[in-house]
Amino acid sequence: MDYNYEESIGRNIGLLTPEEQEIIRNTTISIVGVGGVGSWAAVMVAKTGFGHIIVVDKDEYELPNMVEQLFAKTDTFGKTKAEVAKQEAAKHGPFANIKAVVKDIQSVDDAKAVCQGADYIICGVDDAVARVQMDRASRELRIPIIMAANIGWRITVSTHTPDGISYEEHTHQPSLGKELSPQIAESLHLQQKVYIASIAGFTPAYVEKFFRGEVSYISYLAVPAAFAASAAVNEVLKLITGKGKTNISPNGLTFDMLNMGHLDPKEIGMRTYRIMQAVMGKGIEEGIKTWKETRGET
């Protein structure tokens, strides 16, 4: 069957102008990490009519991915996420040129390689060091990057332009202005762990296991992942069209889907700082105690 582009995206027109839709058709977007946020984003950009899509991931789908990741299905277990994302997104955007890249992001050069030629980047990778590497690569390549994450019941989305505030600066990463040494990588992972515990809405029993390293997974839900993806793709549309209000740093979206309201980044930052100081000063058990105190629990 032949698919007519104009007919397939025709109902976008009215919210988008034909001229804006043509820009979208000629735009290349790189989605790095197509597990949770990235899988939902891949479908959304295809449905919106983006003509050139790069999907990047090193992993294969497994049974536990089903709770969060759109393309984790009974017939995709053991298959690479990038290749599956390419096939699935093509069903929603048959006119799109979709490239799958099976690659682990272990350096800024790796990050640059998977984003060459892109006009926009949506970063949905989980690893703290890889997120910093993606941020640095985007600035070197002068490509706007949207950092998106679903963290328990909450989501965070922020947009970073080449001449604006970087993700590292926006989130006060310990790597800012430093080489990504093993020691800095350890600090990044610790801060990420504390931040996740501070914001996610985990149960106290899970937090104790999470801090002690007794669980091999981070607890996720599908609904926040889809919401974070929606917000990320929406950022790209606003950047392209100039419509609406973007979340360009120092702005950012931190939303609580459990209580349906925005979270105060300063409050989250102070909570994270207190727990970090406790962990670094007296160890994990003190960090757990401080987490409970900051959550109003005994």
Language-model-detected regions and their locations in the chain:
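Phosphate-binding loop/pocket of nucleotide- and phosphate-handling active sites
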Residues: 1-14, 238-298
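Conserved SAM/SAH-binding loop
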Residues: 102-110
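Hydrophobic/small residue at the entry helix of a nucleotide-binding pocket
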Residues: 37-38
